[in-house]
């Protein structure tokens, strides 16, 4: 959900670290020749290896195996954007596709005089007078279609092709997402007020920063915009670098941060209902995503899973994920800069977003 705290305010190349190379001399003592006289034949020291030496060898072997596993990527390097491989024609096509999609979305769904969304929201609202219940129903409908179609992706792509399936997926998911976002914007202050913390000094700045950070987790799909728009053939990716080193499910983490920030700021029952719906959907999405990746990538996914975590930084802290020295470079890439620009742009565009939502009267 792309709204932020400012809704309520007045101002609104794959990295392969070199493998650890063990020393050529193993920690065993060389056999020593005992002193002897001409009358005594030489004899070798047959003292057994000490437990200390054996332990060192075992530790060395385990360390080597762990280092090799952590330094050999089986997934893809995320957020790579090579200008030399970009085609101007592809981005012109992307712009044209985006324009057509937005036009059709407006005429067929959003516009109250021609679209279907108003009738859809009215039908859902007729089920309950509670904005919280309507909010949860809208989330449930979106989640069923979005996650359901994601689960059917492999079969659907085999049946009609990757691009055609992406068009159908987006054609259903996008209108439902827009409807849910607009309903939240229009009714976010219609619930029962549970707490009021907006007057606490510094809380707005803290929550705004939290919301800003959440977008770096929320939108990893910006790494492949041409695939999102089906300009390039859509693929299932097994990412392993960048934000994935911190958490295997960045969208879940970003959504939790976003929900907590907005719920703390708004402080009412509608915000709580929206957060319950969003977080529940993303928890299921994390489980379902792991299941689908395990089916598609098999052992490669299991390797990535072993050295990543869902909880941010957990795999790093317990040593399963070893960050390369230049880890920060995985974030100094165009897609992350694009996320920064779009997030700031959305912040300053909030008055326009609110006005557009209010005019729909959903």
Q: What do the PLM-derived regions correspond to, one by one?
A:
Residues 72-75, 107-121, 147-164:
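Membrane-interface helix-loop junction between the first two transmembrane segments
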Residues 80-96, 126-134, 331-335:
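N-terminal membrane topogenic signal
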């Amino acid at each position: 959900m792309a709204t932020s705290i400012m809704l309520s305010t007045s101002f609104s190349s794959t990295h392969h670290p070199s493998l650890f190379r063990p020393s050529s001399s193993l920690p065993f003592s060389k056999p020593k020749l005992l002193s002897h006289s001409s009358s005594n034949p030489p004899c070798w020291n047959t003292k057994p290896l000490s437990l200390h030496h054996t332990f060192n060898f075992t530790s060395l072997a385990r360390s080597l195996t762990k280092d090799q596993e952590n330094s050999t990527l089986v997934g893809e390097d995320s957020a790579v954007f090579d200008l030399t491989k970009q085609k101007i024609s592809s981005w012109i096509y992307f712009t044209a596709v985006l324009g057509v999609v937005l036009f059709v979305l407006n005429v067929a769904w959003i516009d109250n005089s021609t679209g279907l969304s108003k009738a859809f929201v009215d039908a859902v609202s007729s089920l309950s007078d509670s904005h919280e219940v309507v909010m949860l129903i809208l989330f449930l409908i979106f989640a069923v279609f979005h996650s359901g179609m994601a689960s059917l992706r492999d079969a659907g792509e085999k049946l009609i092709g990757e691009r055609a399936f992406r068009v159908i997926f987006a054609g259903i998911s996008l209108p439902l997402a827009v409807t849910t976002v607009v309903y939240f914007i229009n009714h976010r202050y219609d619930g029962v007020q549970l707490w009021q913390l907006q007057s606490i000094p510094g809380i707005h700045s803290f929550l705004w920063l939290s919301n800003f950070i959440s977008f770096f987790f929320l939108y990893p799909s910006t790494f492949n915009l041409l695939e999102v728009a089906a300009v390039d053939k859509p693929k299932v990716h097994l990412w392993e670098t960048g934000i994935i080193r911190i958490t295997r499910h960045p969208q879940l983490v970003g959504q939790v941060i976003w929900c907590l920030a907005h719920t703390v700021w708004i402080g009412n029952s509608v915000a709580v209902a929206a957060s319950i719906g969003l977080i529940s959907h993303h928890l299921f999405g994390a489980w379902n995503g792991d299941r689908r990746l395990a089916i598609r990538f098999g052992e490669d996914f299991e390797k990535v899973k072993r050295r990543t975590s869902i909880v941010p930084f957990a795999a790093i802290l317990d040593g399963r994920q070893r960050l390369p020295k230049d880890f920060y470079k995985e974030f100094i890439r165009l897609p992350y800069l694009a996320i920064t620009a779009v997030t700031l742009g959305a912040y300053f565009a909030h008055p326009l977003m609110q006005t557009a939502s209010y005019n729909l009267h959903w």
